[in-house]
Regions:
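Non-catalytic helical/linker scaffolds that mediate oligomerization, partner binding
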Residues: 1-472
């Protein structure tokens, strides 16, 4: 059985050779994530090249995702590099530049003294250390430590419930975005999305560079959950980034947000990734915990297009074992025919109705596959959200679309020459499927396409076709 749910792997020091990246692809990586929170541009350029070379060598479509750091709020530096804040003591966070001491340290967020008020919470290092604001004195925010622990240079700070006035992208993000676009990545992930309007800032940079690619909204902030439907509509895909989300929201709400985000994304034919701590223990151990295996399984059961590995593959000790373990868990869950909640959404668009119709025809006629010709990937994504048991085969003349469809559930993509007629389409299907060795002459497939071919948004055709027969 072919795995349908895709796997996203973060590249890093543990995968910093061409052989390691090729092993990742062979183990099951569908999309490579370049994390711009770490590494230099030269590191990302090297990884980009390795992924493209591995994709060409293996014949597998592999997408490349550039994940922007976002305007992360951090502490400054301590004179001694670190300290330990005890529960109950008072510390000061200042917007002034200073050499950090045990009692007073700076922050990169220069509006903190303006935005903070008594009772606000600050969480340091993904919530490991908790503070509550006592008062604001000039440029200093006086806090009481509610949960003590070690703190060190440049640790991240979350401000749950505080209406922070930071832009959607920092200067670093803009530079990284321009670099990633010129490099040729297939997706951009925007961190700390709060509003559907955030995508417009990304598009403005893309238009300046002269290249648009799909933008993924990372759901990490309470404001994103409040604006969830509008954000799903505005962006091209979403990522349920459970690390920061679990700091900003009560932990018990995160599983419900995950399920809701997946459902809304499926209704709108937008790919959805579930990320963070999926097999975290495998950074150090060769086997995951039972809870982690269940977590991966539940993301599949919820209907996610993809599951993501972060530190497990970027710095972990058991990189290939982790990817192979995730692939095995996914495949085991996918053998359950009732694994995904059905979509109650009723399509109202032409392509939506055609995709539902093609799925129904294919399943009722016991077709061997659904085949979609696409210029943009949209029709394929509309088919992918239905999670049909039939193989979903996409044909496109565009290399970037082939790579982008590596993120979509259950999709196997073929790069083909442009065609001028539907007869040429059917010939391409016959040639490609017979060459695979998995299909035979006379097998029934259902083809979705646009006539005339080659025009974005022209999908208007469902054709029931027998491979190798002159029904065209």
């Amino acid at each position: 059985m072919t795995r349908r749910t895709k796997i996203v792997c973060t590249l890093g020091p543990a995968t910093a050779t061409g052989d390691r990246v090729r092993e990742l692809v062979e183990s099951g990586m569908d999309v490579a994530r370049l994390n711009f929170s770490h590494g230099e541009h030269s590191d990302h350029e090297d990884n980009y090249r390795r992924v493209r070379e591995a994709s060409d060598a293996t014949g597998r479509a592999v997408g490349i995702l550039a994940d922007l750091q976002g305007p992360k709020i951090r502490l400054g530096r301590f004179v001694e590099g670190k300290t330990y804040w005890e529960t109950g003591e008072q510390v000061r966070i200042t917007v002034e530049d200073c050499d950090g001491t045990h009692d007073r340290v700076s922050t990169t967020y220069k509006q903190l003294a303006q935005d903070a008020k008594a009772g606000d919470r600050l969480l340091v290092d993904d919530g490991k250390v908790g503070l509550v604001v006592v008062e604001v004195e000039g440029n200093d925010v006086v806090c009481r430590v509610t949960e003590g622990g070690p703190v060190s240079n440049n640790k991240g700070v979350s401000l749950p419930g505080m209406n922070v006035s930071v832009p959607a992208m920092s200067e670093k993000d803009i530079e990284d975005l321009e670099f990633a676009l010129r490099l040729g990545v297939d997706f951009i992930a925007l961190s700390f999305v709060r509003s559907p309007a955030d995508v417009e800032l990304v598009h403005a940079v893309m238009d300046r560079v002269g290249r648009r690619v799909p933008v993924i909204a990372k759901l990490e902030k309470p404001e994103a959950i409040e604006n969830l439907e509008a954000i799903v509509l505005a962006f091209d895909a979403v990522m349920v980034a459970r690390g920061d989300l679990g700091v900003e929201l009560p932990l018990e709400q995160v599983p419900l947000v995950q399920k809701r985000a997946i459902q809304i994304a499926r209704e709108n034919a937008k790919p959805v990734i579930v990320a963070t701590q999926m097999l975290e223990s495998m950074i150090e151990n060769s086997r995951p915990t039972r809870a982690e295996a269940s977590d991966v399984a539940n993301a599949v059961l919820d209907g996610a297009d993809a599951v993501m590995l972060s530190g497990e593959t970027s710095v972990g000790k058991y990189v290939m074992e982790t990817v192979q373990t995730m692939a095995r868990i996914v495949q085991a869950v996918e053998t359950d025919p009732a694994r995904v909640p059905p979509l109650t959404h009723v399509p109202r668009t032409k392509r939506g109705v055609i995709s539902y119709g093609a799925r129904d025809i294919g399943e009722r006629l016991d077709a061997k596959a659904l085949v979609a010709f696409t210029q943009s990937g949209d029709t394929v994504r509309r088919l992918a959200r239905l999670h049909t048991p039939l193989p979903l085969l996409a044909f496109t003349p565009l290399p970037e679309v082939r790579s982008q469809l590596a993120l979509s559930w259950g999709t196997e993509t073929f790069l083909v020459d442009p065609v001028a007629t539907t007869d040429q389409m059917f010939f391409q299907v016959d040639h490609a499927l017979l060459s695979l060795g998995r299909y035979n002459k006379g097998d029934l497939v259902v083809i979705v396409a646009g006539s005339p071919p080659g025009t974005v948004g022209s999908t208007n055709l469902i054709h029931v076709h027998r491979i190798g027969e002159e029904d065209h």
